[in-house]
C-alpha cells in the first residue's frame, strides 16, 4: 500500500487548556467542520464525542487523552487535503501527567485560553511542559461571547505571565453579547459566520470603520514580527516598509516553528465562530512531522545516540504514549510512529522490557469510534490491540533494528490513601484492577504497607485518587473503603558526616564479614541520590562495591526517621576492609545499610513536606476571610492581583493543611470563590509537625 497523504500534509497537534477554557467544545467543532461528526456534542449535556469514559461525561471534564484523525482542505478549499491527528489533553492539574505524555508525541499545539479567565495556573504548567519539549504553538482565545471577555488582556497575560512573544494575527469584532466575528490581519478583511448555518458558511467584508486604526496598528506589529525571521525579510521590510502576503506567512511560520513567537487568534467555539480560521492556521503555521527535529534514541549498547528521521524507508520506531482499557476490544496501546512502516501481524520489539510482541489489530481512533487499518507509517498516530507488556513511555521498534527512544520522566506522587476491599471476592479483583490502572497511568502507584498489610495507592491529588477509586467501582466492579488521605513526606539530611558500618558474624562454619566507611552529604533539593566509590588499593574488592550502594538504596526506600523515602543524599565509599573467605555481597550490603542508617541519624536529619502552589479567585468582599484562612493553614501569600469581578490570590501552602479546603472555601465565600492547586516543591517541615509525624510512625 502506498501512502495516502504525503507526510508534509500531516499535522500532529494537541489541544491543551485550562479546565474551563472550552477545549472539548473547540475539539468538537473541529470534528464537526472537518466533517467527521455530524451532530455537535456539547460538554454540558455530557455528550461530547471526545470525552469517552463515563466519569468524564458526568464530571464534564476530560480525563483521558483520546486521539482522533480528521481531514481539512481549508475554509475556501484552498489547500490539498491535510490529515490532522488531534490528541485531546486534560486540563485538570491532577492529570498533568497526561498532558506531559501527549506533548511528548505532538509536533505542535493549540493552547486554548478563556477570554474571561485568561492565563490560569494550569496554563502555566502546560506552557512549561510545552517549552520543555520545544512544541510550537498557536493561542486560541475562546469564549469571546462571554461577559467580561477581553482579547487584549489575555494577549498581555501570555506576554507577562508566560513570558512568550504573543503576536495577534486576528482581532475580535465586538465582544461579549456583541461578539460578531474577527478581523483577519493577514488579509485585512472582516469575517462573519452565518449563525443559521451553524457557522458552516461565512462572509468576508471590509473592516468596520471604527476598527481600522486598531487593525492597522496590530498588522504593523505582526509584519515586524514576521520580518525578524531572517535577514532577507528584514532588509526587504526596511527598504520597502511592507512585506508581501507570502513573505509574512513565511516569516510567521518560521518563527512559530522555532518557538520564538506565539500567534494569537480568537473566537467562540460554542457560538461556531473562529474555528475554521483556527484550522487554517494549524495548516499554515504548525509543523509537519518532517519539519521538527528528528527524534533521538539509543542503540542496544546504551551509548550510541542515533536519530530516526520521519520517513517510511527508515527502520520502524514508535513511542507508546497511552494505555487505555476498552470495554469491547480490551487493552489499547496508543502509539506515535516516528519512522518506518508497520503492518498488522508484524512483530515489534520493546527494548525497555526486553520483549518481542506481535501486533494484532491496528485501529485508527475517532474519539470512541474506531476504524480498522492494515498499516501505519511515519507520522501516524494509531492504537494497537493486544500488546501485553507495554507501559506508557515504552519504545516499540523493528526487532532487527533495535533502538530505545527517549524515556518520558514522570513526577512522584504527593498524596496517598489506604484502600480496603469490602468483601473477600473484591480482594482478588482489586489487586488485578489496581495493577491494570498503574500500567495505564505512571503517576499512579500501588504498594502494600508491610506492617499493616494495607494497600496504599498514591497519586497527584485528591481528584486523581477519587477517579481511580471510581474506576475500580465502575470498570472493575470492585467495592472499596477508602481511608483518610496521607501526605507523602520525604526525609533528608542537613550536614556532612563520616560513618563506619561493620557486619561480622564468625561463629563456626562459613562466616560473614563486611566493613565500610562512608561519607554522607546533603545534595541540592531535587538532585536525588548519588553513590561514588573513592576506594583505592582494593581495600574493598570491586565486586562488593555495588552491594554497598544497594544497601544504602534499600534503607532510603524504607526511610529512617519516620518510614518515608530518603531523598537528596550523596554517599561516598572511601574506606573499608574485607576477609578472603567470609566476605560476600550480602555482608557488604548489610554493612552499607548499617552505615547509612546510623550515619543518617547523626547527619542532622529532617522531614520534608510537599508544598502546593495555590491560586484562589474570590469576590473582593471575601478577600480578608480567604487570606486569613490561608495564613491559618501555614500558607504564605505571594501575590494578589485585581481581576474583573474580584481578586486573584497566589500562595504557597503545605499539602497537609489543604485537605478539605474546597468545603471551607465554599462556606467562607458562599460558594463564590474557586481555587486550583498543584505541587510546587518540598520544604522542611516545622519541628512541631515533624515530631508529630515521627511519633505516629514509631
From Swiss-Prot:
GO terms under cellular component: cytoplasm
Cell location: Cytoplasm
PROSITE patterns: G_TR_1 (PS00301), G_TR_2 (PS51722)
Domain tr-type G, first and last residues per copy: 8-290
Gene3D superfamilies: 3.30.230.10, 3.30.70.240, Elongation Factor G (Translational Gtpase), domain 3, P-loop containing nucleotide triphosphate hydrolases, Translation factors
Domain of life from the UniProt record: Bacteria
Main subcellular location of this protein, as a coarse class: cytoplasm
GO molecular function: GTP binding; GTPase activity; guanosine tetraphosphate binding; translation elongation factor activity
Keywords: Cytoplasm, Elongation factor, GTP-binding, Nucleotide-binding, Protein biosynthesis
Presence of keyword Nucleotide-binding: yes
Residues engaged in binding GTP: 17-24, 88-92, 142-145
UniProt GO BP: ribosome disassembly
Function, as annotated: Catalyzes the GTP-dependent ribosomal translocation step during translation elongation. During this step, the ribosome changes from the pre-translocational (PRE) to the post-translocational (POST) state as the newly formed A-site-bound peptidyl-tRNA and P-site-bound deacylated tRNA move to the P and E sites, respectively. Catalyzes the coordinated movement of the two tRNA molecules, the mRNA and conformational changes in the ribosome.
Similarity annotation: Belongs to the TRAFAC class translation factor GTPase superfamily. Classic translation factor GTPase family. EF-G/EF-2 subfamily.
NCBIfam families reported in the protein's UniProt record: EF-G, PRK12740.1-3, PRK12740.1-5, small_GTP
Stated name of the protein: Elongation factor G
Organism encoding this protein: Halorhodospira halophila (strain DSM 244 / SL1) (Ectothiorhodospira halophila (strain DSM 244 / SL1))
Organism phylogeny: Bacteria, Pseudomonadati, Pseudomonadota, Gammaproteobacteria, Chromatiales
Gene designation: fusA
